Amino acid sequence: LPLATMMVNPKPASAAAATKSSITPDAALTQWKASVVAIDTLLDRWDSLAGGDAIRKELGTANFGTETSPLFQIQKAFKVLRDNDDSISDLVEFTEQSEEFTNALNRADTMAYSANFAGGSGKPTPPKVYTDKAKIEVQDMKRIAKSISSLLVTSP
C-alpha cells in the first residue's frame, strides 16, 4: 500500500511548492522590460562584440562574469505573466508570441555558439557567417518583442 501511494503522489507537498516560481508578476514585467532594452542595446553594440560568446552572454544563454542578462530564464517570466490573468490582453496571442520569441532566442544562441567553432579545417566557414545569422534572429526577437509588449497590460 505505501508503494501505491508513492506512485500516485511521487512528490511531497513541500517539493511541489518548491517548484513554483518565486517571481512575482511585477518582477516578471520588470524583467521583460529590461529584456527589451537589452535587445536594443545588443543590436546597437553588435559590431563591437567580440565573437559568439559575447553575443551569448548578452542573450543570457552563457553567463560569464558577475552580470546576468535580463534575458536569462525569460521563459520563467513569460510563465508568470501567462499565469497572471491581469497582465495580458490576449492570452492565446501572448502564448504564441512568447513561444516564437523563445524559438528566435534559441536560434540566435545556436548561431552565436556555432561562430565559436567556425573556421576549422577543410572548407571552413568564417565565424562572421554565424554571427550575421545570429543578428538576423536577434532582429526577429526585437520584432516579436514589440508584439509581446503590446499585449501586456501595464496599468490597472
PLM regions and their residue ranges:
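N-terminal twin-arginine translocation
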Residues: 2-22
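Alpha-helical segments in soluble extracytoplasmic regions
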Residues: 27-90, 94-100, 104-105
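Small-side-chain structural scaffolding
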Residues: 13-16, 79, 112
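Domain-wide signal for the mature, well-folded portions of proteins, strongly enriched
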Residues: 5-12, 42, 56, 141
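C-terminal amphipathic alpha-helix
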Residues: 25-46, 104-156
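Intrinsically disordered, low-complexity segments enriched in small/polar residues
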Residues: 1, 49-50, 118
